[in-house]
Curated annotation (Swiss-Prot):
Belongs to the SixA phosphatase family. This is Uncharacterized protein At3g52155, chloroplastic. InterPro entries: His_Pase_superF_clade-1, His_PPase_superfam. GO terms for cellular component: chloroplast. Residues 1-28 form a transit peptide. GO terms for molecular function: hydrolase activity. Keywords: Chloroplast, Hydrolase, Plastid, Transit peptide. The keyword Ribonucleoprotein does not apply. Pfam families: His_Phos_1. Coiled coil: none annotated. Gene3D superfamilies: Phosphoglycerate mutase-like.
Amino acid sequence: MLSLQCLPPFFISVPNRSTNSCSTAPLRAVSDFAASPSTSISRRLILLRHAHSSWDDLSLRDHDRPLSKTGEADAAKVAQILSSLGWLPQLILSSDATRTRETLKSMQAQVDGFMEANVHFIPSFYSIAAMDGQTAEHLQNIISKYSTPDISTIMCMGHNKGWEEAASMLSGASIKLKTCNAALLQAFGNSWEEAFALSGPGGWKLEGLVAPDSSIFV
């Protein structure tokens, strides 16, 4: 069982641990990297599940469902918490589903720093999240494609079950992400590709979990 220590507000620092409970596809490994601890750069990854969506219009496709009023408020709260923790992304990679777009819109309206990030909407984030054990490797590939060495913090916005699986596989902890919950992960490398290669599955440090309220489930 993980030992949790509460930090204000609504942030929990979580020790890293290894587990074999996640049944997922292996991440691509690169054995040629040789990072020096003195020069290796911190790479911070935010895995954020979209905020609560509305089911009022049952004629809409799942892809097109908007946020509920609760979801809009929760997204604004999480944006403020991430800002207060100093976890503002320079690059945002998001599913193109309406509820993820609107989650980002609410975050940008609350905190100007989210407006400054470079944003790419990735259609495959919507579909990959439904496939068993595929999300972590897909995130690695997309992040490696869009990142540059000067970017230290990236936020990926998407859906369950894939986002929970990816957070669990990368950190080695058993992570549950409710709507608008975020896992904060850290690794080191002179590039994002190197950080993934050196850390491997289970090697990303789980720095904490963020939620719009004080209910955190690990």
